[in-house]
Amino acid sequence: MNYNKKSIEDIDVKGKKVLVRCDFNVPLNEGKITDENRLVGALPTIKYLMEKGAKIILCSHMGKPKGEPKKELSLLPVAKRLSEMLNKEVIFADDDNVVGENAKKAVEDMKDGDVVLLQNTRYRKEETKNEEVFSKELASLADVFVNDAFGTAHRAHCSTVGVTNYLKEAACGYLIQKELKFLGNAVEKPERPFVAILGGAKVSDKINVINNLLDKVDTLIIGGGMGYTFLKAQGYTIGNSLVEEDKVEYSKEMIDKAKEKGVNLLLPIDNVVADKFDKDASPVITEDQNIGEGYMGLDIGPKTAKIYSDAIKSAKTVVWNGPMGVFEFKSFANGTIEVAKAMADSDAVTIIGGGDSAAAVNILGFGDKMTHISTGGGASLEFLEGKELPGIAALNDK
């Protein structure tokens, strides 16, 4: 895939109507935004376009309204908060059909530097099916398209891909540019040693990632729920731990592939276990890899955490996707904390692949110590799998 795409700095936007696909899919509680990270992430692109005298038309989805208007998934709270952040009124075009009379009038009345926000694109059933009719309507409002929503770059929807069929100029915003730079370099030309850490519950979610990364990394570290499937593949007992029986054979193949490729594959050598999945369960540390009857693994053990941390300390590039244990439960958060600490203390390029690991790093207060925290869980995974991301492929090449 070609990651060398035109950015907003490569196009003349003065006086032009610029449709910007943002990721404003933020959590709401009673109409209040509880996590503003995604809004903050969009500001550099919006501010640049304002300074350059563009007419800025923002669009995004929120949640899964499944093709019909749902008041609780309206982008009105986003328009209000953005107005405060930009010190400028963001006009909210509240049309249930997204491109309706309000949107058309708001866009018609725009002066250079003005900002309009359209209603939730997923109010339209055509959006997720990438149907022409809605793509055309969105494109009809603008002269130029800018995609700055990395979180949905792996989806071919009207607002990410379809509009590019009708707008000649299509470039990426600063957020996607940054994602492409860091993730692209990690996958294409990493500084070595290159260490990848994969956690989370399921091997099946990460099958292609494991396979692709074994061709690229020097060390692959595996923790989290998926570690138990690998332990079973090595012949250890895993008690009542999470396991994917149908992936045991695949895990054996990956262990063999790592040997073949000369990749240092690190798996747990001890575990923190409990007799139930509960935040108040008593943690027990195992002597070795084996987990006894009636117990389930809920975190990597201290010896494992030390080995993983040492591997991170000697790395020049580290990519992490997925926690090492049930970090929401205090007694089983230590593995994730140790990995995050080792990355925070490292002078390597450290990249967090969105989703749960990003949440963990931010909760632990290490966010500002990382080189880059990806804004897209699913998109960053597909990127690490080596897949082409439709929302990026559709933009103009440099």
From Swiss-Prot:
Residues the record lists as binding ATP: 206, 297, 328, 354-357
Gene Ontology molecular-function annotations: ADP binding; ATP binding; phosphoglycerate kinase activity
Lineage: Bacteria, Bacillati, Bacillota, Clostridia, Eubacteriales
Main EC class the enzyme belongs to: transferase
Keyword tags: ATP-binding, Cytoplasm, Glycolysis, Kinase, Nucleotide-binding, Transferase
PANTHER family: PHOSPHOGLYCERATE KINASE (PTHR11406), PHOSPHOGLYCERATE KINASE 1, CHLOROPLASTIC-RELATED (PTHR11406:SF23)
Pathway in which the depicted protein is active: Carbohydrate degradation; glycolysis; pyruvate from D-glyceraldehyde 3-phosphate: step 2/5
Family affiliation: Belongs to the phosphoglycerate kinase family.
Compartment(s): Cytoplasm
Keyword Kinase: yes
InterPro entries per UniProt: Phosphoglycerate_kinase, Phosphoglycerate_kinase_CS, Phosphoglycerate_kinase_N, Phosphoglycerate_kinase_sf
Enzyme Commission code: 2.7.2.3
Catalytic activity: (2R)-3-phosphoglycerate + ATP = (2R)-3-phospho-glyceroyl phosphate + ADP
Any single Pfam family the record assigns to this protein: PGK
PROSITE patterns reported in the protein's UniProt record: PGLYCERATE_KINASE
GO cellular component annotations of the record: cytosol
Sequence intervals crossing the membrane: none
Binding site for substrate: 23-25, 38, 61-64, 122, 155
Subunit annotation: Monomer.
Name used for this protein in its record: Phosphoglycerate kinase
Source superkingdom: Bacteria
GO biological process, one term: glycolytic process
